[in-house]
């Protein structure tokens, strides 16, 4: 098949969704498909276009399997400025739509167009490109954006909320297929399509995946040594510092357990809050994003990882970092809604524990239990790599995406 992919990030950009889409592309290429990616210039690490990529609105490179076209993302230096971020998404989306008519031959027919959300704005753009290129349109949902933004209070303007939900419904209805990461997300999308869905619309569940040949436990502690984390117990959160994450739990843990080293890796809208806390708490370390190739080393540095998602978001978001943590053999404490996809995953893998979201006491008890029982902590962590190999391999995900893109029934 000839496939066009529209996504916000792609290697060498360090965003988690970029890692996911890069893996999808590599898997499809291994299966013999011609791929043309339209994405942003790398910008995620410092929220500005990286110096070696700056100076042009677009850049195109030819690959052995197709091409990569990168366009300016118009990033906002302040992730809390939602208006500026929205305008940046609109500008990026417009450039993606304009440039996507060229890869693989000017407006030549393709077999399928795959667009990733967030940003939600790529939905209708993907549909328009698919119409122009006479291909099937598949909408890939990583997070149900309007729901998450509304529930965290990131968006409060009623007009903007109505517009976001309208755009979401239109994007779903225009798609030939929608892919989601869990049954919870599938239920969410199906409910919004109810009574208005096209008979041809398919909602397929394809969990994210990790390359466990690369993302594997790292012996030793080079990351600990580099950042002075010591030899004692280390509890880590690694990922986006956004409104959806209950980072106050990590700060409270550092405040109430001074004997434990607490590490928050990443960047985002809540960076200033985390940085301020780290200046007053000697056992709390804030470390910025590291190069993607260091991920196995970073995740292996912790004894315990925390995946904190605010109450009500468990059904609309599946933190892909969970798979990465399991791959390096570390146990997870998930502060997340009961019965959510991540809670079920940890129970199935026997690789961690789930606690109620936003509950400091529950987190303290869970950390105390694992720190106090090193054998159980190591046993839970040891279950992760095998579960990933059995359930979250790139090969299985690539086959599933191939079927959806080809129009085979998967839902």
Locations of regions flagged by a protein language model:
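N-terminal subdomain of nucleotide-sugar transferases
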Residues: 1-62, 252-255, 411
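Carbohydrate-associated surface elements
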Residues: 41, 184, 206-209
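Membrane-proximal helix-turn-helix segments that form the acceptor-binding/catalytic region
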Residues: 101, 121-124, 128-132, 158-178
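Acidic anion/phosphate-binding donor-loop and adjacent secondary structure
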Residues: 190-194, 209-226, 246
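Conserved donor-binding/catalytic core segment of Leloir-type glycosyltransferases
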Residues: 210, 229-245, 251-255, 263
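Nucleotide-activated donor-binding/catalytic signature segment of Leloir-type glycosyltransferases, i.e.
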Residues: 232, 263, 271-296
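Nucleotide-sugar-dependent
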Residues: 245, 289-300, 305-326, 331-344
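A short, well-ordered alpha-helix in the C-terminal region of glycosyltransferases
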Residues: 362, 369, 376-390
């Amino acid at each position: 098949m000839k496939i066009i992919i529209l996504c916000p990030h792609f290697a060498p950009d360090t965003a988690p969704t970029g890692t996911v889409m890069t893996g999808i592309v590599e898997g499809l290429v291994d299966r013999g498909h011609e791929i043309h990616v339209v994405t942003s210039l790398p910008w995620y690490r410092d929220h500005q276009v990286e110096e070696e990529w700056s100076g042009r609105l677009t850049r195109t490179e030819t690959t052995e399997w197709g091409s990569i076209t990168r366009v300016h993302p118009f990033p906002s230096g302040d992730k809390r400025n939602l208006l500026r971020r929205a305008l940046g998404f609109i500008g990026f989306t417009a450039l993606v739509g304009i440039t996507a008519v060229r890869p693989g031959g000017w407006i030549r027919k393709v077999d399928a167009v795959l667009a990733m959300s967030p940003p939600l704005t790529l939905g209708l753009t993907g549909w328009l490109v698919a119409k122009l290129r006479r291909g099937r349109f598949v909408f890939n949902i990583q997070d149900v954006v309007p729901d998450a933004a509304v529930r965290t209070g990131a968006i409060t303007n009623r007009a903007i909320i109505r517009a976001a939900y309208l755009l979401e419904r239109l994007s779903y209805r225009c798609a030939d297929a929608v892919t989601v990461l869990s049954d919870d997300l599938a239920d969410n999308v199906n409910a919004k399509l109810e009574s208005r869905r096209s008979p041809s619309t398919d909602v397929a569940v394809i969990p994210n995946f990790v390359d466990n040949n690369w993302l594997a436990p790292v012996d030793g502690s080079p990351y600990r040594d580099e950042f002075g984390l010591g030899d004692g117990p280390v509890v880590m959160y690694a990922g986006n510092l956004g409104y959806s994450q209950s980072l106050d739990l990590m700060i409270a843990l550092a405040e109430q357990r001074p004997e434990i080293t607490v590490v928050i890796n990443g960047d985002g809208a809540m960076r200033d809050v985390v940085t301020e806390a780290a200046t007053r708490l000697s056992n709390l370390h804030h470390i910025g994003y590291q190069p993607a190739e260091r991920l196995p080393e970073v995740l292996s540095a912790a004894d315990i990882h925390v995946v904190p998602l605010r109450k009500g978001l468990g059904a609309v978001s599946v933190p892909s970092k969970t798979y990465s943590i399991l791959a390096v053999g570390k146990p997870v404490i998930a502060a997340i809604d009961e019965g959510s996809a991540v809670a079920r995953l940890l129970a199935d893998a026997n690789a961690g524990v789930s606690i109620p979201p936003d509950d400091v006491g529950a987190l303290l008890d869970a950390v105390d239990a694992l720190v106090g029982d090193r054998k159980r902590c190591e046993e839970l962590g040891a279950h992760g790599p095998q579960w990933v190999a059995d359930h979250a391999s790139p090969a299985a995900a690539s086959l599933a995406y191939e079927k959806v893109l080809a129009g085979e029934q998967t839902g």
